[in-house]
């Protein structure tokens, strides 16, 4: 749950960064992190309001979002191929290495650069996180035993293909390494504006911002359904409130707004520490989600042949695939909690709190908080998932839904 809320925050905050760039070009909107956070608040508010719509409406938005992403990527790539007067060489795109972390004095070889490379995997790993959304929406999916599984697989495949094409196209148009690095958070805007023109940059940013808004809405939907499911199983503090849904549309209203508020607070360090705070939020999202992904994989290994397979399964290959997945998750969870900037290491000369990777604090804090809660309390009464609830609960819920109502009150 921690990872799902954090990834919602990361997506929304990334959207706010791109939206700030667009508004800065259009209206000279301030591009400081305080103003970015203001936009972020409005984006999360909008995501919450849209998630109040009926399920068929949000499903239509998700379908439109998928087409927007695919067509949008093709448009951006096509424009980046045709419009810029100058493109980088293939050797530059696939062979150029840059180290702006301060480690090793900027070296691009040896063990130091290998360390820099590993910490730089964060954003790549972050992009491969949302595929579990299909599972969260399985109760609202036709033929979920097959559809949800294929949704997870295809989301990764599509992300890899379209994401790689987009990254390569952008890299071919990088005008100047030094100035691009100096642009920091707004590096993409700098690349597009310098390689083409302000108007072209505005168009591409508009496409990207709309796509990110769709992602924020979808992630809010996914996180709210996860929180609702956990609450229904009585696994979340205050579950009596969180598992309630609206009478008319059966929307988990309270979990939607709970996710919105928690996601809004997650990247709060960015208010003071800028991009480093946002990057740490992203690391929390990756670590939290992948630990959650790892737990059922471990349980599958433990079950062995006693495990009852579903309609979609890995067959006899599950063992080696599971071990690779577990080892990789353990590895990245360690790497992404390490310092990513030289100035963020306390004993280094010029140490600056603005460069500290604070990821270990909330990650370890969450383990202590929720682990302690389980040891001291939850293990005494939590009996595992409640798939459908008791017969009495089902009868009461269905009776409430069938009763006529004059307004969409909550139950």
Predicted region positions:
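Hydrophobic transmembrane alpha-helices that form the core helical bundles
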Residues: 1-44, 48-52, 209-226, 277, ...
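Membrane-interface loop-to-helix entry segments
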Residues: 36-97, 129, 152-157, 282-295, ...
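Transmembrane helix-loop junctions in multi-pass membrane proteins
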Residues: 50-56, 200, 262-281, 302-306, ...
